[in-house]
């Protein structure tokens, strides 16, 4: 609520409580007091009154005075009656004012309530009732604007209130309890709740399934130094950093950590030779001295165990695994594993068996060699990477090597593009080609004929008396190519390439906007004023030519005033934003006008300087 509304409410309350309108107006209209001082003065005035003063104190006081002075009643009875009637009239006027303000407040409260219930879909309000309330409010506004009686206006308002009372049984407690419960769960839940439920990464591919919170927890738990998130622009950079941290950690430790990596999947050696990639069985009697690595099956439930282990290794999984017998032959063991499958009998074993083969070894994919990376001159001069680093990469890292190199290549390509663009802009730094063309073409038009010297500025609309000779001369030329729109943005774009700290350029843009708005409002008057010196066959094109030519003359003069300002290679953001907004206003002003134009014809008898000037007015800078 602003200051005027506060003063109005305070004055109304003071008049109601004190019945002294003159003194309240004196306090309200005192310019030396601030808002708080006025409110304090009205409060002190109300407190100074005697408590228990009746509502009609003024009327009773006037009646008592009349009764106590019978001489005055006999002398001038009409004056006493006038005083009483004036007091009653003032009270009636104040009551009417209060009733009107009460209707306004009730109407606004109902509008706010209906809008809230319509927009909040989670509050299940009856749509039919809301529509009836809206209809009653619209009827209230129509009756109020048409000057209907107070009873009709109050009837519509009371109907809307009665309909709204039917919606008061809507309970918002369920909605508020649900939102408070969600907020409490969000506050109480730890930040790393999802990260704690997921298993720790045991291979490099596991990092691709982690989100940013899980990656952050892994880095905080395994990185001793301070991690700077500002150096990493995306989630992929954080993921690559976590992968590098995992590689360094697995390379430094001789044995993998129990909580992050599974034990090596090496099959147990057997006494009898077995074909490649066949599960091996081992009992405690066959391997009494083999060490048993600790395994963590609870952290990797989806990872299948490639080989059956002994009871000492996984006592929890022993009941679900078949118990092999030491004196079984190789055929019986395989048959017990694949009972429902027809297997060939008496298959001879191979002569040689490679025990170094690993079960479940991932086969490498063959693909075409990648394209050479697009790098800058600095990278070409950099020494090549060490081949030992490349040989030490695992198969999983080689699968992602192409993706990482492609990502780096794209970054280098973007950097090279920005460097070339900056180099290209640096060649034109300090050169404003559009400004130079505007100055040269406008000066050429002014110097060709004496009558082209612009006498007006953009502070007002161009006067016909200043362009009498020019109008008669232009009537012999073809002006059908003059566009009936104003290219405000294109003509004033050179101003955005100046570094102006005093806001002179922004002020000129606002002045140019006012100039074109005034010309659009007075276009009909200018047409009649210019036609008095004619008549002219192409009067609309003639008026538009004078409007634009007068502006170009003033713009050329303004360029001379800001010639000492430093130039920019790119537009000033502040100036450019103002120019875009003002361009919309100018186009809207001229878009509402109607013109009487002729067909465009090619008349080569027009002089070259006039053709260049018309092209410049149409924002066509290909003139030189």
UniProtKB/Swiss-Prot annotation:
Q: Where are the A- repeats?
A: 256-268, 269-280
* UniProt keywords, alphabetically: Capsid protein, Repeat, Virion
Bilayer-spanning residue ranges:
none
Tell me the InterPro entries matching this sequence.
Nucleo_P80/P87
The protein's location, in the record's own words, is: Virion
Please note every region of biased composition (Low complexity): 279-324
Q: Where is this region: Disordered?
A: 183-208, 254-326, 341-410
Q: List the disulfide bonds.
A: none
Q: 2 X 13 AA tandem repeats, motif A: where is this region?
A: 256-280
Q: Which GO terms describe its cellular component?
A: viral capsid
Q: Which Pfam families match?
A: Nucleo_P87 (PF07267)
**Position of the signal peptide:** none
Q: Where is this region: 3 X 11 AA repeats, motif B?
A: 283-324
Q: Spell out the residue ranges that the record assigns to B- repeats.
A: 283-293, 296-306, 314-324
**Protein name, please?**
Capsid protein p87
């Amino acid at each position: 609520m602003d200051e005027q509304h506060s003063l109005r409410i305070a004055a109304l309350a003071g008049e109601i409580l004190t019945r002294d309108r003159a003194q309240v107006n004196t306090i309200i209209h005192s310019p030396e007091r601030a808002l708080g001082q006025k409110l304090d003065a009205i409060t002190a005035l109300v407190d100074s009154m005697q408590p228990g003063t009746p509502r009609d104190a003024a009327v009773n006081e006037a009646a008592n005075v009349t009764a106590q002075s019978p001489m005055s009643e006999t002398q001038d009875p009409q004056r006493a009656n006038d005083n009483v009637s004036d007091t009653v009239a003032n009270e009636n006027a104040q009551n009417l004012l209060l009733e009107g303000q009460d209707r306004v407040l009730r109407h606004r409260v109902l509008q706010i309530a209906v809008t809230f219930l319509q927009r909040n879909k989670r509050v299940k309000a009856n749509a039919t009732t809301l529509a009836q309330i809206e209809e009653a409010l619209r009827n209230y506004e129509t009756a109020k604007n048409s000057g209907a009686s107070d009873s009709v206006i109050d009837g519509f308002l009371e109907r809307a209130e009665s309909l709204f009372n039917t919606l008061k049984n809507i309970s918002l407690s369920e909605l508020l309890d649900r939102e408070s419960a969600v907020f409490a769960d969000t506050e109480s839940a730890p930040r790393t709740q999802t990260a704690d439920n997921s298993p720790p990464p045991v291979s490099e591919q596991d990092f691709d399934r982690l989100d940013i919170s899980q990656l952050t927890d892994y880095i905080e738990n395994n990185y001793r130094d301070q991690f700077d998130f500002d150096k990493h622009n995306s989630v992929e950079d954080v993921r690559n950093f976590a992968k590098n941290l995992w590689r360094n950690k697995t390379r430094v430790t001789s044995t993998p950590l129990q909580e992050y990596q599974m034990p090596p999947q090496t099959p147990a050696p057997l006494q009898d030779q077995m074909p490649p990639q066949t599960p091996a069985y081992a009992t405690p009697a066959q391997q009494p001295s083999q060490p048993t690595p600790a395994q963590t099956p609870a952290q990797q439930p989806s990872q299948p165990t490639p080989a059956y282990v002994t009871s000492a290794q996984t006592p929890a999984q022993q009941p679900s695994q078949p118990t092999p017998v030491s004196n079984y032959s190789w055929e019986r063991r395989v048959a017990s594993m694949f009972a429902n499958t027809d297997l060939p009998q008496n298959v001879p074993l191979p002569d040689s068996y490679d025990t170094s083969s690993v079960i479940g070894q991932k086969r490498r994919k063959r693909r075409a060699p990648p394209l050479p990376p697009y790098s800058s001159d600095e990278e070409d001069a950099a020494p090549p990477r060490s081949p030992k680093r490349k040989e030490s990469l695992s198969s999983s890292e080689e699968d992602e090597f192409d993706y990482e190199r492609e990502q780096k290549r794209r970054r280098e390509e973007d950097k090279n593009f920005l460097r070339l663009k900056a180099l290209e802009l640096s060649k034109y730094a300090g050169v404003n080609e559009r400004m130079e063309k505007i100055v040269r073409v406008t000066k050429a038009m002014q110097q060709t004929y004496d009558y082209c010297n612009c006498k007006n500025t953009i502070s007002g609309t161009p006067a016909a008396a200043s362009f009498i000779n020019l109008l008669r001369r232009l009537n012999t030329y073809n002006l059908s190519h003059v566009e009936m729109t104003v290219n405000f943005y294109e003509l004033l774009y050179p101003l955005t390439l100046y570094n102006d700290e005093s806001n002179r350029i922004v002020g000129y843009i606002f002045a140019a906007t006012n100039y074109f708005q005034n010309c659009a409002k007075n276009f009909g008057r200018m047409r009649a004023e210019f036609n008095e010196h004619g008549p002219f066959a192409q009067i609309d094109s003639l008026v538009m030519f004078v409007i634009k030519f007068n502006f170009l003359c003033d713009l050329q003069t303004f360029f001379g005033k800001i010639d000492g300002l430093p130039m920019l290679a790119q537009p000033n953001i502040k100036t450019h934003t103002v120019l875009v907004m003002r361009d919309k206003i100018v186009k809207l002003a001229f878009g509402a006008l109607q013109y009487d134009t002729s067909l465009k014809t090619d008349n080569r008898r027009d002089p070259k300087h006039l053709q260049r000037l018309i092209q410049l007015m149409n924002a066509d800078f290909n003139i030189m």
